[in-house]
Amino acid sequence: MTRKQKRLAIIGGGVGFLTAAVLLVMFAFSQAVAYFYVPGDLAKADLAPGTRIRLGGLVEAGSVKRGDGKTVTFSVTDTLAVVPVTYTGILPDLFREGQGVVAEGAFVAGSSVFVADTVLAKHDETYMPKDVADRLKAQGVTLGGKENIQ
């Protein structure tokens, strides 16, 4: 092999290695990504049952029901739509009606109930998409816990 052929072989091997690494990273990210939706956007979204998503909004007033053991059912709303959620586990200390929440999980096939395996409670609109926070403020919902949904 000449020097030129060796150089081309090394460059070709490096490009092949980098291509394989990029493809593996892209595949891993596509499996781990959970897109964020608010209840009003779910009607437009074409989600297959079992697709993992993050559902964000406010815990609807009067919707929290404690079941057997650690099972809790509640509804998440963005004032346009309401989604029933079931969660089994210990809820965060900041979780309460009228407060912001992000639940990660999936819809069960043949059901409109969102089954969450992770629930994060928020105390204000800091991590809420701007359009959702603006819509809630326009409806008179204060996101610091001072006022609840009417």
Curated annotation (Swiss-Prot):
InterPro entries: CcmE, CcmE-like_sf, NA-bd_OB-fold. Keywords: Cell inner membrane, Cell membrane, Cytochrome c-type biogenesis, Heme, Iron, Membrane, Metal-binding, Signal-anchor, Transmembrane, Transmembrane helix. One of its GO terms (molecular function) is metal ion binding. The gene is ccmE. The keyword Heme applies. Belongs to the CcmE/CycJ family. The chain crosses the membrane at residues 8-28. GO terms for biological process: cytochrome complex assembly. It comes from Sinorhizobium fredii (strain NBRC 101917 / NGR234). GO terms for cellular component: plasma membrane. The keyword Glycosyltransferase does not apply. It is a single-pass type II membrane protein. Heme binds at residues 123, 127. Heme chaperone required for the biogenesis of c-type cytochromes. Transiently binds heme delivered by CcmC and transfers the heme to apo-cytochromes in a process facilitated by CcmF and CcmH. Disulfide bonds: none annotated. Residues 1-7 are cytoplasmic. It is found in: Cell inner membrane. Residues 29-150 are periplasmic. This is Cytochrome c-type biogenesis protein CcmE. It holds the Pfam family CcmE.
